[in-house]
């Protein structure tokens, strides 16, 4: 239309009055400018269309400038110029990349042989022996560089080659999960190695992995692993949604993630399983649970989680089922004793001493008659001192920690009894209670807190306070539910099938059904 307007004006200019010549001249100039603009717009749209069709990224010099601005004052950011028939720029983070891999996977393929004529030739050379990605935008470039990739770019294209350095420690037995029999491999801080340890045990295409990134600055990789033929889809979706909703600067360990995927942030008892052993994680996945591998952490999270799992040990499934059952009963009794012994000692001395046999009562009275503190203050003092020694032992080196424990337990205890500050029965009760806590190491802190609270209530209300405290705790545990799983299953609600691996452990030969307390698609264990 602009061409027709200009042609019409040029042909009719001599036939018009002179007064209209100025107006038509202005219109002609406007039409010519519109013609030029239309031509330029056509070129622009053709270039945009070409970019969409070819997928190429133009103006790589702008990307290089943006990288230099982003990593300004960062000596770790490195650029190199390579000429292989066409000028190329290599960009990478020196601390994340291996010089040997850059030489073998990037520089040598580019400079070896004939000169490259185009970028497609460069791609073919680089893809023969390395993992290669093509960033779609500037944010993808930043992401691959942060993961140890080397970005190769010319004026119009870019490609990234995996040259990350390997910083993984040896696979050893976890110090917190040692066993007499069974596998001794443990997870390490590298997420891909941990995923390999799981895949080595689950050689099936049903093992699915969803990759997520968490943390504004750390951009930590999280692998959500599950068996698609066993795990319930609604549980998997809920776990993925909980991880995707996390908004935090950084995730440095799996314990960060456990606080976010636990829906009840104020729960006293943890409701997310944690393990350092691949065989334990695989065993839980075979029951329908979801495992989460966090890069940088040797701990793997598992959900849903049952309280009865605290009584189970990794070595239980490699021992005789009779011995396993006895050990679990012993753990259960130890936990109850560690929580209730101090409170029962206090209430029986202060309020309900008539329940104690006469000879035992006389012995206790002879040991405590010169003590300046009340039984409540005496027991709380012992509990606090024991917790201080335990915390100091954790913070000190192993050799010093052993000496500190011996000095604290023997020297201080003996000196306090001889000085008449505390009684020998109270020291014995406090020691038994403290040792019993370590039969359930994952809940030591919360059990220690409950022990202190119940002891105080026993000193105020007597045996009635102990009974009421245990009822409140039991009701609280019964009300807990996470990811469609009751926390106290298989006892409340009662599930007879699940009791084969609760406190008593039946033979593996009799395990025919998967736990009903864990949502799953396939209830049969025997390959069906």
Roles of regions detected by a PLM:
Residues 319, 323-326, 367, 393, ...:
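Membrane-interfacial loop-to-transmembrane-helix junctions in polytopic alpha-helical membrane proteins
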Residues 350-368:
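Membrane-interface interhelical connector segments
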Residues 2, 6, 17, 21, ...:
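Membrane-embedded alpha-helical signal segments
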Residues 344, 360, 369-528:
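Generic detector of multi-pass transmembrane helix bundles and their immediately adjacent loops
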Residues 323-340, 367, 371-375, 407, ...:
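Loop-to-transmembrane-helix entry motif
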